[in-house]
C-alpha cells in the first residue's frame, strides 16, 4: 500500500495520511476545516516500512484501513522546569 502524506499549513507538525493522493472523502469535514489546506509532502510505501518518525506504523496501517486516514499530531510540550520541581519535591507554599 502506498499512502499520501500531507502537512498542515495551519497546524505546525501536523500530518494527515490518506490512502490515495488527493482523496479526502473519508476524512471528516470538521477535521479538514481544522487542518486547513493540505500540502503534499510525500507518497509513502507504507507496507515496506518498519517504523515512521513519531508515529506507530501498526496504528497508521490499521487506521488507514479502518478509517481511510491517520492524523499525526505533534508530541505535547514538556515543561522541564515543572517536571524537575516535582522530582525534587519542591513546593512553594
UniProtKB/Swiss-Prot annotation:
It comes from the Bacteria. Residues 1-85 form the YcgL domain. It holds the Pfam family YcgL. InterPro entries: YcgL-like_sf, YcgL_dom. This is YcgL domain-containing protein Spea_2443.
Amino acid at each position: 500500500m502506498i499512502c499520501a502524506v500531507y502537512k498542515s499549513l495551519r497546524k505546525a507538525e501536523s500530518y494527515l495520511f490518506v490512502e490515495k493522493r488527493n482523496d479526502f472523502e473519508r476524512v471528516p469535514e470538521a477535521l479538514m476545516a481544522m487542518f486547513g489546506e493540505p500540502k503534499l509532502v510525500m507518497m509513502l510505501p507504507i507496507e515496506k516500512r518498519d517504523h515512521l518518525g513519531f508515529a506507530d506504523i501498526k496504528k497508521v496501517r490499521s487506521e488507514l484501513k479502518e478509517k481511510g486516514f491517520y492524523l499525526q499530531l505533534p508530541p505535547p510540550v514538556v515543561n522541564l522546569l515543572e517536571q524537575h520541581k516535582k522530582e525534587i519535591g519542591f513546593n512553594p507554599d
